[in-house]
């Protein structure tokens, strides 16, 4: 049973890689998000824990899932590895800690043109919706010192995580920069978008998420 499960998971990831190879995504202007938009509605977000960008905590992302038997993602070969949402390390960010309210995740990297500047947009919207919506900015595979300097120079106060080896970006099918995931409370995907957004456009996505959350809770 485990062998068959491993084969299915392997084929799924291979399919995502093939699609990513055949589709070139350019920054800005929107378009389809590889991976995220191909997933079904209410897709449960994979658990992960990463170092906070400005912290002194070092290491790669922890993507060990809580339940290896029912997870749609492979678990680490080391069965003793602590699941991401069970770690308690100073300077770490766990995605599950954001699941108590609607959540926006921004995936980005400095090689993606103006992606760093797009986080200024996220910061402004974060300030507008602070308390009612969670925000997580996740830098993928950049130099850590460069990230720390960006946080300092831009004055970001929103949570900023660091995905050093790109494990989280791979799990989430990030195919362009910036990629945004809009998430229901509890950690299931509501929608996704790719490309640069204005404050008004990102706020529009947040409002749509809030309305969808209200409808879901009323049903």
Predicted regions and their residues:
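Conserved segment of the thioredoxin-like fold in thiol-based oxidoreductases
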Residues: 117-120, 124-164, 177
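Conserved redox-active cysteine motifs that mediate thiol-disulfide chemistry
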Residues: 99, 107-124
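Thiol/disulfide oxidoreductase modules built on the thioredoxin-like
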Residues: 100, 149-157, 164-219
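Short alpha-helical
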Residues: 113, 142-145, 167, 197
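N-terminal targeting signals for export/organelle localization
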Residues: 1-82, 218-219
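Short beta-strand-to-loop junctions in surface cap/lid or active-site-entrance loops
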Residues: 93-98
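Hydrophobic beta-strand anchors of alpha/beta hydrolase catalytic cores
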Residues: 104-105, 135, 180
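Short gly/ser/thr-rich secondary-structure transition/capping motifs
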Residues: 51-56, 82-90, 160-163
């Amino acid at each position: 049973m485990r062998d068959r499960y491993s084969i299915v998971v392997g084929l799924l990831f291979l399919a995502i890689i093939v699609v990513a190879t055949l589709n070139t995504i350019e920054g800005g202007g929107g378009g389809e998000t590889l991976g995220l938009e191909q997933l079904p509605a209410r897709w449960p977000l994979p658990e992960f824990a990463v170092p906070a960008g400005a912290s002194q905590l070092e290491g790669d992302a922890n993507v060990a899932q809580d339940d290896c038997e029912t997870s749609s993602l492979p678990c680490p070969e080391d069965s003793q590895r602590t699941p991401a949402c069970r770690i308690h390390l100073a300077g770490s960010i766990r995605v599950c800690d954001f699941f108590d309210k609607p959540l926006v995740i921004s995936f980005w990297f400095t090689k993606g043109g103006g992606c760093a500047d797009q986080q200024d947009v996220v910061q402004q919207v974060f300030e507008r919706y602070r308390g009612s919506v969670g925000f997580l900015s996740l830098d993928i595979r950049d130099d850590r010192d460069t990230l720390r300097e960006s946080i300092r120079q831009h004055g970001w106060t929103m949570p900023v995580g660091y995905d050093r080896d790109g494990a989280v970006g791979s799990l989430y099918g990030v195919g362009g920069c910036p990629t945004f995931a809009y998430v229901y409370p509890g950690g299931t995907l509501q929608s996704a978008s790719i490309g640069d957004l204005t404050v008004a456009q990102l706020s529009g996505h947040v409002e749509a998420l809030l309305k969808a959350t209200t409808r879901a809770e009323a049903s």
